[in-house]
A protein has these predicted regions:
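Intrinsically disordered, low-complexity non-transmembrane regions of multi-pass membrane transporters
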Residues: 1-19, 25, 71, 75, ...
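Transmembrane helical segments that form the transport core of multi-pass membrane transport proteins
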Residues: 223-310
Length: 383
């Protein structure tokens, strides 16, 4: 009888109920809210769903992220091994290759001025950097946090790992991906506030056709130029352009399909669950997390506003040939930001088609965010 009682007592105390804190329960609720947003509202479900599930798992069973040095038998938790691939900057680079394989740089090649709009939208990154310094973060932490302003989750993870800010990786990644999914909610009010209805109705001319040779040369030239100037950007820009070269060369269709489909989705699963698993209650529920979330929102708003304002400047310079709305697409949330530009423009004039024009600044923003990350790495002497 004593044996049965002891066994039952051990079983009961092995349940998670006796090992969780109020913080764990709060994070479980947050994870369930994220799952609801991903499934019911379809807010970036490909990313938000695995992130939310990783968050759920680590707050029920913390040992799923057990560090190998803390393990009594020398074996780490399952998601710990996934997380190492984030820390080693492997996952973000593979994500960039997949993005490159899915991206058409034709609108950017057809209208090189789009680079300026993509660059203008990076203002949010540097606004967040100085804001983070003012809030008491050190230089490297501020740099890692600031990339949220580019609405680029993989680059945020990449830079946080390279700068040794792994303790902040969870809040940074969750904030970055959350704001990426909230692009359709955050951007329109800013865009409408900074533009007149007349400006939103501006119709832009047809983009010129882009030859196959131009599309093949573009990733090669960008890789050479950017990597020579900022070698630290090679892992991100190089993988982005390699994926695009797969696509545009037309001779490696199998590699294009693999990079843009099977490999991409495998990496998203591993990246999402491991990032979510960094959000344990003890790591996530603190003042720094609130600061990071606030800074991310401010940075994203600043980046959107800077893009729109520069778009207005280009509108004046071209005597009304540029719709300022495409400037907001300069953040690197591809293709969500470009779709928002199209949607807001269509609300003013249903016959206005801005999507392809907005894709230029949008893909330029991807390159711009990677360059900003490389700049921070160069400044801090990290390779």
């Amino acid at each position: 009888m004593d044996y049965i009682v002891t066994t039952l007592d051990n079983l009961i105390h092995q349940t998670a109920f006796f090992n969780l804190t109020w913080g764990n329960y709060l994070m479980i609720v947050v994870a369930c809210v994220f799952l609801y947003l991903a499934i019911a509202k379809e807010f970036e479900p490909l990313l938000l769903l695995p992130i939310a599930f990783g968050m759920l798992l680590v707050n029920i069973y913390p040992d799923i992220m057990l560090h190998i040095e803390d393990s009594p038998n020398g074996t780490g938790g399952l998601l710990y091994y996934f997380y190492l691939l984030d820390e080693w900057a492997i996952m973000p680079s593979l994500i960039f290759m997949g993005v490159g394989a899915m991206t058409d740089f034709g609108p950017l090649i057809a209208n090189p001025k789009s680079f300026l709009l993509g660059a203008a939208a990076q203002f949010g990154i540097f606004a967040a950097y100085f804001g983070a310094i003012a809030m008491g973060f050190n230089d490297k932490a501020a740099a890692a946090i600031s990339i949220i302003g580019g609405a680029d989750g993989p680059t945020s993870i990449f830079l946080a790992g390279k700068l040794g800010q792994t303790a902040l990786l969870g809040p940074i990644a969750v904030a970055a991906y959350s704001y990426m999914s909230l692009v359709p909610i955050i951007q329109p009010p800013i865009m409408k506030l900074l533009t007149t209805e007349k400006e939103r109705k501006i119709k832009m001319g047809q983009l010129r056709p882009v030859s196959k040779l131009e599309k093949i040369l573009f990733p090669i030239i960008v890789t050479i130029v950017v990597s020579l100037i900022l070698p630290t950007t090679a892992p991100l820009v190089g993988m982005l352009m390699l994926g695009n070269l797969f696509r545009e060369s037309g001779v490696v269709r199998q590699l294009t399909d693999t990079a843009s489909n099977a490999l991409m989705y495998i990496v998203v699963i591993l990246l999402g669950t491991s990032v979510g698993a960094t959000t344990s209650a003890e790591a996530f529920l603190n003042l720094d997390t609130l600061k990071i979330v606030a800074l991310g929102l401010i940075a994203f708003a600043f980046g959107t506003a800077a893009g729109v304002l520069f778009g207005k400047l280009m509108c004046v310079a071209t005597k009304g040939k540029v719709n300022p709305l495409i400037g907001s697409a300069g953040v690197s949330a591809v293709p969500m930001a470009a779709r928002v530009s199209q949607k807001v423009g269509a609300e003013a004039d249903p016959t206005n088609f801005l999507l392809m024009h907005a894709m230029g600044p949008n893909v330029a923003g991807v390159i711009g965010t990677a360059v900003a990350a490389g700049t921070f790495m160069a400044v801090f002497g990290v390779f």
